[in-house]
């Protein structure tokens, strides 16, 4: 009987995540657990959430869909689920800030999806100096940091204020789709080590050294940046606008505007950028 219950639970989780992928753009998932924050207090729509509190962090320990609302002050959302499980975080007018670290740290998951609810405005702000429990640690190092694949999508707006290092950092593949995304950073504004894809999104990147970066060098199918499907990207940065190790592609119908202090496109591999799309000005290039 116990074995059967576990099988049913696994099947329910799989159906929930399939529903996440099929949820129409801008709508929330009715199967989500609702998490409402007020300062450092949390109220939930169900009793058994699988969330534990560790040193000021609300730790999600089970895969599934979670809808986040309200204002989390001086805290952190941490995702720490088995590598075989996926997590969807629905931001529905959600604000979070941390005085000591990143407000969102995806430590482990198969992948994580941040879904921005229609009409919602969401803001995350990190600390100017991070405190690590182990001085040897250097992660997280971005306002939103993911150790695994991360997708940000939906028709809402997300503001990310990176005050310590990177604005958004992803160790694997970073995908941005359909949403409005405004990010500031001190070092790299957005970085996906393996890849960055921006599809049909409106993205504004300010501050920092490099604006969009992917630097994996040991795999020929990674280390790429793709801007597609009419994406609109505005960049104002101190160094390179777009930097990748393997390839950069900017499709026709997209626009990349703004100013950079370094190269507009920096890649030792393949560059395929539509000339009309590239409207950005470089301080070092004619």
Predicted region positions:
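A composition-driven surface/loop motif
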Residues: 9, 20-286
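Bacterial N-terminal signal peptides that target proteins for export
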Residues: 1-8
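Bacterial Sec-type N-terminal signal peptides, specifically the leucine/valine-rich hydrophobic h-region
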Residues: 14-17
């Amino acid at each position: 009987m116990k074995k059967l219950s576990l099988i049913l639970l696994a099947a329910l989780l799989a159906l929930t995540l399939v529903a996440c992928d099929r949820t129409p753009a801008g709508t929330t998932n009715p199967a989500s657990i609702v998490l409402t924050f007020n300062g450092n207090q949390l109220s939930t729509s169900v009793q058994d959430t699988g969330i534990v509190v560790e040193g000021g962090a609300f730790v999600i320990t089970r895969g599934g869909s979670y809808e986040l609302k309200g204002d989390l002050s001086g805290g952190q959302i941490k995702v720490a689920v088995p590598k075989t499980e996926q997590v969807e975080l629905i931001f529905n007018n959600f604000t979070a800030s941390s005085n000591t670290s990143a407000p969102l740290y995806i430590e482990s998951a198969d992948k994580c999806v941040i879904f921005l609810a229609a009409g919602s405005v969401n803001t995350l702000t990190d600390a100017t100096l991070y405190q690590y429990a182990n001085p040897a640690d250097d992660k997280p190092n971005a306002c939103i940091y993911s150790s695994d694949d991360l997708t940000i999508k939906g028709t809402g707006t997300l503001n990310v204020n990176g005050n310590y290092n990177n604005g958004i950092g992803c160790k694997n593949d970073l995908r941005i789709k359909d949403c409005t995304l405004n990010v500031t950073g001190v070092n790299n504004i957005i970085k996906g080590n393996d890849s960055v894809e921006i599809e049909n999104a409106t993205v504004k990147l300010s501050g920092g050294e490099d604006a969009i970066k992917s630097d994996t060098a040991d795999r020929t199918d990674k280390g790429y940046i793709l801007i597609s499907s009419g994406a609109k990207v505005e960049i104002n940065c101190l160094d390179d606008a777009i930097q990748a190790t393997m390839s950069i592609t900017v499709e026709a119908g997209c626009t990349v505007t703004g100013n950079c202090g370094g190269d507009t496109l920096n890649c030792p591999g393949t560059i395929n950028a539509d000339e009309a799309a590239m409207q950005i000005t470089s301080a070092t290039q004619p």
